[in-house]
Amino acid sequence: MKGKKLSLVSSLLLALSALLIVASVFFPYWKMVFFAPQYPEGLNIIVFPNKLEGEIDIVNGLNHYIGMENFSAENFPELNYLLYIMIGLAVITLLTAIIRKKAMLYGVIGLFGILGILGVYDLSRALKKFGTNLDPMAPIKIDPFVPPILGHNTVANFVTESMLGYGTYFLIAAFILLLIPLWKDRKR
């Protein structure tokens, strides 16, 4: 039975991972900044696990001209439950740290990976929806487009820059802390 237990150091790494997951919910996960000659300082859409922030009203006013749907919490139902999923993941990670079973660690890593893949898929789906479902009656006609999850994009006179937020970096660090015990305790 001893061979299936995680070491105390690994358990502490898992507890730290749980703490990083909790900390992540207080920071943005993703953001997009819109730059144009009339907005050289940029307009932000900032995505937290439970809300949108930034100059959303201004962005929506501008997007109206190209027929893009409004950015709002109502259009992102994930914001109603993502916070709870992240807290649940932190609790499961902490329980794994306390119980110290390798099998539980494998489950947490798998769950974390699945949630990460679903998160990237969901964001890419939303960006595609917003960029390709343009109102044909809009005052300004542009070709449909898909804003990138990361990087730059140009539409008309707007340059957008998409980037990860600090919350995502905390999640990446938390995931790395989950992987270290796999290597550290590989012979246990």
Stretches found by the model and what they are:
Residues L20-F27, T96, L118, D122, ...:
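Residue-level signal for alpha-helical transmembrane segments in multi-pass membrane proteins
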Residues M1-L8, E74-P77, I99-A103, V155-G165:
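Juxtamembrane loop-transmembrane helix junctions in multi-pass integral membrane proteins
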